[in-house]
Amino acid sequence: ASGLAKDLNEPISVALIGSGVSSKSDDAIALGADKVYVVDDSVFENYLNETYTVAVAQVAEQVNPRIILLGHTPNGRELGPSVAVKLETGIATDTTSLDIVDGKLEATRSLSGGLFRQKTGFPKFPNIATVHPKSFDGAEPDSSRSGETETVSVNVASGDLRSRFVSHTEAISEGIKLEDAKVIICGGRGMGSKEGFDGLYEFTGLIGESAVASTRAASDSEFCGQELMIGITGKVVSPDVYFAIALSGASQHMAGCSGSKNIIAINKDPEANIFKESQFGVVGDYQAVIPAFLDELKQLD
């Protein structure tokens, strides 16, 4: 956002929406916001697309921004398009690069699991984009920065809502979260069994800030729980290193990991698509490759 604001010579505004979020405005300013619009109401205690769409749209109508950015998170990828419809404008989703061309946003995103890149322009304002997680370096907080905070009231007519919040259940997982892991070890259906898949956890004992993940096929085969699934129907991650083990590299899976800085493939099929997607690859049976690799790691340790 800071780079775009500099190119446009415009301030950075942040909308804080939720319940009890007023105290977070100083954090937003420290991270680069010039002005923070706070929508603090108990109706926003839990995310509901309808209420948040109204809030974002009403703030946008008051502020009249040229660009609106949201994270391409499970909530963001639902919220972004609904806000675009509300404001009658366009949106680019899951973007990995943002530039200013002729005073308007030009967004780049991956297609077909990273096989293609698409550039999207916008004919009217506001330009809306959801941003792929970890596509940009995070800002370092600067507590000396000053900014302005304004409380905004929005009108959410509860009688018009077609949905309601029921409950929130958080998946319990051991160790570091997939979204926070710098190294991810992902196993596919080619692992063959739950016992084979469980062997991947030996990596996490040797590599710091690492986590185990799965493909949809491995999860459907009950090698692990769905909370580990990466891809279109799972989580989107962008680690520094992504081990793709015994998986084919289908576009549906690559959509969740194509933002990885380095992909290391291990597959006994030399024609597997994953080798086209990876920076490094080993052709071989994972049952022979992984023990040798782990032995080398232990020697380094």
Predicted regions, residues:
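N-terminal glycine-rich FAD/FM-binding segment characteristic of electron-transfer flavoproteins
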Residues: S2-D301
